[in-house]
């Protein structure tokens, strides 16, 4: 038996690569040298919420943009409701049901253009932007063909219910 444990990388937005200066992955978000005045977070999963909460407690004004219409959809509704209250009380600002249309990086910050849940065009200007929209497997260049491994559409190794490959 062989275990393939190649890890993962943060998923980037299609038109906004991580520069780890203005547009940050969760790794880059831990390396910010000073507290930004304003911070945007795209994605309200566990990592995005953790990063937003940390930087809010340090003094940044934090806005979290989430594509899903609700908060923590995979969690019990009561727990999600209480968590949203707690994060809001900390001072995090949330917008749900957004559709990001453009991210422009400038010398002084990042401009995020999006449609809100009502379909209205909105622009958010922040010093830094954390993109926390999931992870992608590190399987590029793994050379799976000679050993017969299959990758799914996301690049993960295909396994059965017992975590065995083909």
Feature locations, PLM:
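Short loop/edge segments at beta-strand edges and connector loops
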Residues: 6, 25-27, 96-98, 114, ...
């Amino acid at each position: 038996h062989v275990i393939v444990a190649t890890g993962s990388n943060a998923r980037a937005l299609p038109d906004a690569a991580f520069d780890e200066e203005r547009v940050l992955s969760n790794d880059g978000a831990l390396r910010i040298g000073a507290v930004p005045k304003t911070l945007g977070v795209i994605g309200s999963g566990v990592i995005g919420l953790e990063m937003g909460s940390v930087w809010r407690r340090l003094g940044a004004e934090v806005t979290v943009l989430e594509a899903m219409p609700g908060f923590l959809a995979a969690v019990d509704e009561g727990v999600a409701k209480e968590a949203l209250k707690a994060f809001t009380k900390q001072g995090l600002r949330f917008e749900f049901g957004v559709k990001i249309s453009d991210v422009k990086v400038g010398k002084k910050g990042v401009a995020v253009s999006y449609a809100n849940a009502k379909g209205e065009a909105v622009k958010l200007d922040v010093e830094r932007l954390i993109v926390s929209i999931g992870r992608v497997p590190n399987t590029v260049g793994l050379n799976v063909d000679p050993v017969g491994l299959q990758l799914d559409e996301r690049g993960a190794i295909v396994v059965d219910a017992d975590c065995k490959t083909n």
